[in-house]
Amino acid sequence: MKKKLVNLTNMYLIGDIGNTEIKIFLFNKNFIKVKKIMFKTKFISNNYLKKKLNFIKNNKIQSSLFSSVVPYAYKKIKNFLTLRFNIKSNELKNMNFSKLVKLKANRLQVGSDRIANAISVIDNKNNFIVVDFGTATTFDVIVKNTYYGGVIAPGVSLSLNTLIEKASLIPLTNLSKISKVVGTNTKLAVKSGFYWGYLGLIDNIIFMIKKQTKKPFKLIFTGGFAYMFKNLKKNKPIIKKDLTIHGLLKVIEKNN
């Protein structure tokens, strides 16, 4: 017996298009998550989207909002949603979000995912440093309700994959926490370099941000390696999953 599909109305479709991965969420009218899908950006095609986004046909989408750092991928998804489901999508940077966050940085050059992260954490009382472990490792500085800018460092996975690709004698290595600094073989040496190296990089960049701004900050981690690098020597982060999506949801709530 086939399971009966239930039509859901007044739904919100929210997506984050990254260099490596795309996340798309469906929220109901009460902003409760109904569905989440994830897939690699490199796989994007109309046939692939038909399979991954087929669930949309059973729902009435009231609003659709994306953050994207991959213009061609957003354009493909936007056109697909318009032609197949008659859904009009917006990209965050094309919207007015000045009531949620003020930008001191160059709006044209700041990724919309980073703006969404800032919107997600802003409470108009505290200052925040948001560290997002994605294709790049980004540090974003938010003071009260103002986004000041940040730091872009090489991403953990990107750096590891490049090292393995370019150095013939470096074996495939899965990163994990490691207690000893000195590795007794190549894999352990690579693990040590990435684990302790990135811990040092993160701690030092946070220290330098505090030194330059002379302000206290709450520290937020998000992204794939957030849990691996949470044990900093000098800073204790709060880990938040899907921070970008929740920032976009905040924009939807404000505009509905």
Question: Which residues does each predicted region cover?
Answer:
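Short beta-strand segments
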Residues: 16, 67, 92, 130-136, ...
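N-terminal glycine/serine-rich phosphate-binding loop of ATP-dependent small-molecule kinases
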Residues: 2-13, 17-97
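Adenine-nucleotide phosphate-binding core of ATP-dependent small-molecule kinases
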Residues: 35-42, 178-215, 230, 236-237
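Alpha-helical phosphate/pyrophosphate-handling elements in metalloenzyme active cores
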Residues: 113-117, 124
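Gly/Thr-rich phosphate-binding beta-strand-loop-beta motif of the actin/hexokinase/Hsp70
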Residues: 8-33, 125-147, 163, 248
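Glycine-rich phosphate-binding loop plus the immediately following alpha-helix
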Residues: 45, 122-124, 148-192, 196, ...
